[in-house]
Amino acid sequence: MSVGCPEPEPPRSLTCCGPGTAPGPGAGVPLLTEDMQALTLRTLAASDVTKHYELVRELGKGTYGKVDLVVYKGTGTKMALKFVNKSKTKLKNFLREVSITNSLSSSPFIIKVFDVVFETEDCYVFAQEYAPAGDLFDIIPPQVGLPEDTVKRCVQQLGLALDFMHGRQLVHRDIKPENVLLFDRECRRVKLADFGMTRRVGCRVKRVSGTIPYTAPEVCQAGRADGLAVDTGVDVWAFGVLIFCVLTGNFPWEAASGADAFFEEFVRWQRGRLPGLPSQWRRFTEPALRMFQRLLALEPERRGPAKEVFRFLKHELTSELRRRPSHRARKPPGDRPPAAGPLRLEAPGPLKRTVLTESGSGSRPAPPAVGSVPLPVPVPVPVPVPVPVPEPGLAPQGPPGRTDGRADKSKGQVVLATAIEICV
């Protein structure tokens, strides 16, 4: 089939290619291989997009592109259309993200994609289910944190999402509140999203550009030339930092490196060289501290699996000190306390949105951000109920014909992407 004069072919869903399936829960869902075969993208003009989709509002916008809430006119289905600027990402990276998300969609704790994949003149576009309550970052009161019952509901579901991914030998590599989507503000139903950096265990990747507070120490220390072999431990570490953030409304440190005094204090505690507790960790109970010691073990091989958090959720995680909101101002970056002396009980900084990119591969899609500073929001008041395990739902069915590859002169040419080598 040539691009200039393509032959018609029947509509098909975007599926993952490759022999075999992953064992365990969800068996039967094919996993992506390193060779993606003959995925097709249909080109739509702006007028064609508005013909099929009614714009409700813009959900987010950044240098990477934008996310729009739309209604597909054919069925009335609400969905989030993600427009990714072609200048900011490669086609193979876009297809990788869509394919991996699709392969994981059988989990009720991972965002689902619709059978909607196309391109415009400037963007690659795909559709995923709409999360009406935004993301987890939006509801965390800065320097206060969320109620413990809300946190436990969220952590339970994220642990199941990570266990599902890791059981298929896939590592998310960008776990943070911005990538956790909410269907209600009490976290009764949350889903993990944004798989643009996901890779298979053992895949060697370049060092990421810069670091964020969720980045594991071994990633911070990796050399730019050698890179790092992907391991589930980086997700477990980020999961531990995320739990700290949602409980406190603060970062535990700015970066997991020796230049950060708060991280160095934590390292001394982990190695048994600090009398007492690190200043930022005194609010936690003994069970919570044991949980953090496992999730945030300095050596990746000593970190427990993500699902290990479940046995700690039956305990109280924070003490009475947790209920006292912190009104301390952030210290300027150059005004840090000396590493040799005791640190005062103050936060290294309130939560802010973060972006991680692949080194040397151009900017990748980042989650939509309203701003670079946290927004004050009311604290949700949860109803005390046991941590729920949502029932698996049916995968969303999108409008047909988005990946059919059929020629239509009124809608531009058909672009074929064949035999793309992708490391996952």
From Swiss-Prot:
Give me the reactions it catalyses: L-seryl-[protein] + ATP = O-phospho-L-seryl-[protein] + ADP + H(+); L-threonyl-[protein] + ATP = O-phospho-L-threonyl-[protein] + ADP + H(+)
Which InterPro entries does the record match to this protein?
Kinase-like_dom_sf, Prot_kinase_dom, Ser/Thr_kinase_AS, Ser/Thr_kinase_Sbk1
Q: What is its EC number?
A: 2.7.11.1
Q: Where is this region: Disordered?
A: 321-373, 390-412
Supply the CDD domains for this chain: STKc_SBK1 (cd13987)
UniProt keyword list? ATP-binding, Cytoplasm, Kinase, Nucleotide-binding, Serine/threonine-protein kinase, Transferase
The free-text function statement in the UniProt record for this protein reads: May be involved in signal-transduction pathways related to the control of brain development.
Name the PANTHER family for this protein: SERINE/THREONINE-PROTEIN KINASE SBK1 (PTHR24359), SERINE_THREONINE-PROTEIN KINASE SBK1 (PTHR24359:SF0)
The protein's name is Serine/threonine-protein kinase SBK1
